[in-house]
Curated annotation (Swiss-Prot):
SUPFAM superfamilies xrefs: Adenine nucleotide alpha hydrolases-like (SSF52402)
Protein name from the UniProt record: tRNA-specific 2-thiouridylase MnmA
S-S bridge residues: 94-193
Site (described: Interaction with tRNA): 120, 331
GO cellular component, one term: cytoplasm
Binding site for ATP: 7-14, 33, 119
Gene3D superfamilies tied to this protein: Adenine nucleotide alpha hydrolases-like domains, HUPs, Translation factors
Pfam families noted in UniProt: tRNA_Me_trans, tRNA_Me_trans_C, tRNA_Me_trans_M
Protein source organism: Gloeothece citriformis (strain PCC 7424)
Keyword rRNA processing set for record: no
UniProt function note: Catalyzes the 2-thiolation of uridine at the wobble position (U34) of tRNA, leading to the formation of s(2)U34.
Subcellular location: Cytoplasm
Gene Ontology biological process terms in this record: tRNA wobble position uridine thiolation
UniProt-annotated catalytic positions: 94, 193
Length: 349
């Protein structure tokens, strides 16, 4: 019998993934990662629901204490990024360093199981010519999460199942109801998991980063107002600047050395190119010559045409056909060719 470890968060997606595989005849083991430190986090609603689902399905349930791994790879990663004026993307980092990698290691070393599954909306293919596993967009483009999975390795893709990749969210809820799952009507999480535990991103950052007042200036250096810490701002931000001006102003740069927030008009917040580091080439080998494809520089943005220029050392330059608004250092630039995710990396300052 095929054995698989399913990551269970206690939500409808992971619950349905586990139930679907169990229904298909897989020998399923549920695994929940204990991520948050602090009072009450050991018995969070998600962990309780995950345990209930496993009991309902009649499958084993393991809880792995990942709090130190989460703090090092996500909390520290976020704080250090915001301190130097970038806006980190924790979800892709979490998927590789906290979830998929450690989950597969636990499955292999502790349970003797060589396959894992999650409730992510994405698909995995295999190219016979290149001999590489490919990461593909989900059928439900509105729920597609491949953008956050660009950092997965070939080993992880070879060992992973995405049972929900070929269905819509509505179908997932319908299937959950058919299985009688407690989580069938559970609302979706609207924020990062760590933000839900702290109230808001601002509250979270203020807990770790000391507020330091500085100037809000225009592109010529004229002081327009004051801020209480550059970690409260991100490139392209318009709301909450607290600066009066005859035309809308946007954050165009964060200067951690001078502790300044630099603002300008919308055109000033546009870029024709950017550098990307820590590239992980997923579905194709690392190219040695320029290629033309599409790039997505924010989760909810549309892919746009780019020229990709390899720089070596896992770095590339993206040259856009048209200037792009609000390209944000620390966020991911992910390359696609149709539904195929070619690779991705982190936008540099």
């Amino acid at each position: 019998m095929n054995r698989v470890v399913v990551g269970l968060s206690g939500g409808v997606d992971s619950s349905t993934a586990a139930a679907s595989l169990h229904h298909q005849g897989y020998d399923v083991v549920g695994l929940t990662l204990w991520l948050m430190k602090g009072k009450g986090q050991c018995c969070s609603e998600g962990m309780v629901d995950a345990a209930f689902i496993c009991e309902q399905l009649g499958i084993p349930h393991h809880i792995v204490d990942s709090r130190d791994v989460f703090e090092k790879n996500i909390i520290d990663y976020l704080v250090s990024g915001y301190e130097v004026g970038i806006t980190p993307l924790p979800c892709s980092q979490c998927n590789r360093a906290v979830k998929f990698g450690p989950m597969l290691n636990y499955a292999r070393q502790e349970l003797g199981i060589d396959r894992i599954a999650t409730g992510h909306y994405a698909r995995i293919g295999y190219d016979e010519v290149s001999g590489r596993y490919q990461l593909l967009r989900a059928v439900d483009r509105n729920k597609d999460q491949s953008y956050f999975l660009y950092d997965l390795t070939q080993d992880l893709l070879a060992a992973t199942l995405f049972p929900l990749g070929n269905q819509t969210k509505e179908e997932t809820r319908r299937i959950a109801h058919e299985f009688g799952l407690k989580t069938a009507d559970k609302p979706e999480s609207q924020d990062l998991c760590l933000i839900e535990a702290h109230g808001s991103m601002q509250e979270f950052l203020d807990k770790y980063i000391k507020q330091k007042e500085g100037d809000i200036v225009d592109l010529k250096g004229k002081v327009l107002g004051k801020h209480k810490g550059i970690h409260h701002y991100t490139i392209g931000q318009r709301k909450g600047l607290g600066v009066a001006a005859p035309e809308p102003l946007y954050v165009v740069k964060l200067d951690p050395i001078m502790n300044r927030v630099i603002v300008g008009n919308r055109a000033d917040a546009g870029q024709s190119e950017c550098n990307v580091s820590r590239m992980n080439w997923v579905s194709i080998p690392d190219p040695s010559t320029p290629i033309q494809t599409e790039a997505q520089v924010r989760y909810r943005s549309f892919p746009v045409r780019v020229n990709v220029i390899p720089l070596g050392d896992n770095r590339i330059t993206l040259v856009f056909d048209e200037p792009q608004f609000g390209i944000t250092p620390g966020q991911a630039a992910v390359l696609y060719q149709g539904d195929i995710l070619l690779g991705g990396g982190i936008i540099e300052k």
